[in-house]
Amino acid sequence: MRKIVVGTIIVLAVGAAAIGWWFLQNQSASAPESKPTPSASKSEKPANPNEHNYMDTDFAKKMIVHNQQGIQMADIAKKNASGEEVRQLAVRMSDELTSDTKQYTDWLTEWKETYFNLSDFPEMEGHDMYPTHPGMASLSDLRELESATGSSVDKLFLRLMIAHHEGANEISNAEYLKGMQFGQMINLKNKTVKKQTEEIQTMKQLQAKGN
C-alpha cells in the first residue's frame, strides 16, 4: 500500500512538472515578441527650417505691434530731437524697425495669418485692449514725447527707447521661443537682439553725456 501511495505521488509530481513546462512553453510561444527599445541617445528628425510653427507666428505678431510703437517714437525724435547724435540714431532706428516690421508682415501674409497693427488698438489710457508688451511706452508717455521740446525730447526719447529695446529683447529671449522653427525668422530675431543690445549701450552713453 505504501509503495502505491509513493508511486502515485511521484506520478503526480512528474505530471505537474510536465504541465508546468508545457504551460511555460506555450506562454512563451504566444507572447508577442518584444521589440528592442529605441536608443535614448537617438535624436529625433530635425524640424524643417523652411516651415513655420505657432511660435513663429506668435512672435511675428508681437513684434509687429512692438516695432510699430518704436517707429512712432523714433519718428517723433527724428523731427524734434535737439541733439544731432540722437536725431541720427532715431533715423536709423526708424529705418531698421520699418524694415523688420515689413518682413514680419510679409511672412504672415504669405502664410495667410491675420495680425493686428498698433493702430487697430483704441488709444485710451488704461484701456484693456491697448498693448502692454514688455518695454512698451504708455499712451501718456507718448503724448509727453510728442509735446516735449528741446533737450527734453532727447532725454525722454532715450529713456523710453532703452526700455523699449530691453522689452523687445525680453520677448525675443522668452523660453518658449526656443521652439521656433522658421530659420529666416530665427536669424532675424537673433540679429535684432544683437543690434538692439548694441543700441542700448549707445543710448546709455548718450545719456551719460547729458542727453
What is the role of each PLM region?
Residues 1-4:
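Positively charged n-region of N-terminal signal peptides that target proteins for export
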Residues 21-211:
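All-alpha RGS (Regulator of G-protein Signaling) helical domain and cognate RGS-like helical scaffolds
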